[in-house]
Amino acid sequence: MEVMAIAKFERFFRLAASLDVDKSDLKRYGDFVNDKIYDLLLRAQAAAKANGRDVIEPHDLPITKGLQERIHEFRRIDEQIELQPILDQLAARPPLDLAYSEETEARFPEIAGGISVALAHSFKVIDPDLKNPQTKHWECVLRIFDLLL
């Protein structure tokens, strides 16, 4: 990841939840975002197939009320730091049995942003005084997300 991109992610986590992250956190973060997008896309694919379609549309994505609110929060933060182009490159488009519509692909960066805001807030839920997430914090938060998404 470029130095400028690293600085934007660091700023994002400070704005979203007053967290200080480092390079090792950013590797875990990238893996996390891609894993969760893949999980959402698997459910979207099942919805599209169940409805007899061969393309995944935005309404197939299982976006909960909470995630939608985090996407809105991401948009407000993104106005300050312009992270969306970096998330567009970061958010993997894993090959599935069905294709994605252009509208679905266009939503990937904002979904990644919403997941990112939820991640940042989750650290504060497990430890309100946390400033610098450690491995144990990452493991706890990842287990929680695996239970829910």
Regions found by a protein language model. Give the residues of each.
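Terminal helix-to-tail segments of small alpha-helical proteins
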Residues: 1-149
